[in-house]
Amino acid sequence: MDLLKGKIKPLYAKYLLAAFGSAMITSVYSIVDTAMVGQYHGPQGTAALAVVAPVWNIIYSLGLLVGIGGSVIFSMKRGSEKESGVENQYFTVAAIGAVLLSVLAWAGVLCFDRPILTFFGADEALLPLAREYMRPIKYVFPLFLFNQMLAAFLRNDKNPGLATLGVLSGGIFNVAGDYFFVFTCDMGIYGAGLATAIGSGISFLVMLTHFISHKNTLRLVKPERPVRKLREITVTGFSTFFIDVAMGILTVLFNRQIMKYLGADALAIYGPIIQVSTFVQCCAYSVGQAA
């Protein structure tokens, strides 16, 4: 697969299918989470997941910031004859940025989950359910950021199929695990969180196999002027980051207003709408990421 000399339509179609498949399964298993928890806990469970929704916007946006920003520059440098050979410096800086951001996000979720979820719209009735869902997720929280970053770099390292396989494998486990943990094991909303946490670990492990494959050209190297390169990455990825963060801010505003004036039952109706809008947003992302 020659990105410089290959025909545009077949190349784009291959990357579009990979990106669209990843986006679709990510959205579908969020919808399944909502459906399973709603069946088990009723409106309170669906409302609790609506409160958690902005958490995903934040962690995914941080992953896209370094993933999209770094992988775009990675491809540009690889395609430039004058600058070929420096692309892995951007991969290294993106990986360092991902570690720093994940540590900050992880510390925030571990130490301040109660005030964060309260700010996102949880009241005293929804807070225990939201925290119960987040309990297993907190321990693997950085993996959600790394999965976004790795998927972006794998697509630009001529392995979009593995990026899709990683997301699909984690997503399929999540769907099956939801039913098993929530109903068969009678774990309720905690089981949905556990399935999501294990699914993210599976996705991460599958994508890591790229680094032992013959297709891999990604290397950790000593970067020159890392701060400058990190600034380039954040500037390039900022537009994608901002779209996701803006969606999260909008969700928080809706959550708070709905809880203030209408209550948890109304928020339970809004929860599935969030998932559908995320699905549409992910489909739009896939078109841009394929390009």
Can you say where each PLM-predicted feature lies in the sequence?
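Alpha-helical transmembrane segments of multi-pass membrane transporters/permeases
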Residues: A98, F153-Y179, Y190-A197, V287
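Helix-terminus/linker motif at the lipid-water interface of multi-pass membrane proteins
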Residues: V28-A47, L117-E124, F180-M187, F241, ...
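Short alpha-helical transmembrane segments in multi-pass integral membrane proteins
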Residues: M1-A19, F74-P142, T184-F238
